């Protein structure tokens, strides 16, 4: 079973407008709302590719209940930890020329809710996987990540990390199965530049030395890299018209896990990750995933 953990769920508001003008009334052409949370997105993609998945997350208020019911209608198992406050609302603006991301911190989480999360995680078992994705809400300290990873290690459950917190460097000492940083996170948290293939190879080498066993590197709307410590793979394909890169990395991770954890060929898993991420980057939210097969035919995977 592939479990996902989202500690800071959200509602995403995707707004589309003409180029923004300061100190003027900027009217939107249309707006789309969708439930979000990085682990939630990973599970939605896993479910799309017919992989059993289980969402564990913190939800609150009417909107939190709405998200949980929507996920259950898709036949996805959800185990919520409840708080009284509703999920945060994140705003993504595309004005035709630029993309703007306004991300809120989320509601403060109390100790009772944290204990709910730990209780729910007792379900993980030997041979399972837990993907920990997203930011920490106020009230949860960074050591909570290590507590969760150590619990999983006791139960022989492998851990996948997709977090932007600077504590990632310390967590690598716990040797997670896979990490999924993006280029901005590597630069900001680890001082690693990945502007070209050579820098990517050097960054991958550093990440493995720090403790990562496998690395899936995403680049927003660009194409991903993968390293298992022995080789580095890269996808090449034409670029898509960007609508929103907000969920592209989550989609790429979910697609990659759907194949890689089933021991399928790395090149095929990476190609599907690339095609799925590109499809989502050309949509608001996760979109309808209608172009993935078309995009897949345009992708070549090369080993550097």
Swiss-Prot record:
Coiled-coil ranges from the UniProt annotation: none
Keywords for this protein: ATP-binding, Carbohydrate metabolism, Kinase, Magnesium, Nucleotide-binding, Transferase
Pathway: Carbohydrate degradation
GO cellular component: cytosol
Keyword Glycosyltransferase in record: no
Name of one Pfam family that matches: PfkB
Any GO MF annotation of the entry: 1-phosphofructokinase activity
EC number: 2.7.1.234
Top-rank taxon: Bacteria
Catalytic residue list: 250 (proton acceptor)
Gene3D superfamilies assigned: 3.40.1190.20
Reactions accelerated catalytically: alpha-D-tagatopyranose 1-phosphate + ATP = D-tagatofuranose 1,6-bisphosphate + ADP + H(+)
Broadest EC class assigned to this enzyme: transferase
Required cofactor(s): Mg(2+)
Similarity comment: family membership: Belongs to the carbohydrate kinase PfkB family.
Functional note: Kinase involved in a D-tagatose catabolic pathway. Catalyzes the phosphorylation of D-tagatose-1-phosphate (Tag-1P) to D-tagatose-1,6-bisphosphate.
Stated name of the protein: D-tagatose-1-phosphate kinase
Natural source organism: Klebsiella oxytoca
Lineage: Bacteria, Pseudomonadati, Pseudomonadota, Gammaproteobacteria, Enterobacterales
């Amino acid at each position: 079973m592939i479990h996902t953990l989202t500690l800071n769920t959200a509602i995403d508001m995707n707004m589309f407008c003409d180029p923004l003008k300061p100190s003027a009334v900027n009217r939107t052409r249309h707006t789309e709302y969708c439930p979000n949370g990085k682990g939630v997105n990973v599970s939605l993609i896993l479910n799309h590719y017919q992989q059993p998945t289980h969402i564990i997350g913190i939800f609150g208020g009417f909107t939190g209940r709405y998200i949980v019911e929507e996920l259950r209608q898709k036949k996805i198992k959800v185990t919520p930890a409840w708080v009284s406050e509703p999920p945060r609302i994140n705003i993504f603006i595309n004005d035709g020329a630029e993309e703007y991301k306004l991300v809120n911190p989320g509601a403060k989480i109390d100790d009772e809710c944290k204990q709910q999360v730990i209780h729910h995680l007792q379900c993980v078992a030997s041979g399972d996987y837990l993907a920990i994705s997203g930011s920490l809400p106020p009230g949860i300290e960074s050591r909570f990540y290590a507590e969760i990873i150590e619990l999983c290690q006791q139960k022989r459950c492998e851990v996948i990390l997709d977090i932007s917190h600077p504590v990632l460097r310390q967590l690598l000492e716990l040797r997670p199965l896979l990490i999924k940083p993006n280029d901005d996170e590597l630069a900001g948290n680890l001082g690693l530049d990945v502007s070209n293939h050579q820098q990517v190879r050097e960054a991958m080498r550093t990440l493995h030395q720090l403790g990562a066993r496998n690395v899936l590197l995403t680049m927003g709307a660009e194409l991903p890299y993968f390293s298992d410590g022995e080789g580095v793979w890269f996808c090449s394909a034409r670029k898509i018209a960007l609508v929103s890169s907000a969920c592209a990395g989550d989609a790429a991770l979910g697609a990659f896990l759907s194949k890689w954890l089933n021991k399928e060929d790395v090149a095929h898993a990476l190609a599907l990750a690339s095609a799925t991420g590109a499809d989502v980057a050309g949509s608001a939210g996760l979109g309808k995933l209608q172009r993935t097969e078309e995009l897949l035919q345009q992708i070549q995977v090369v080993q550097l």
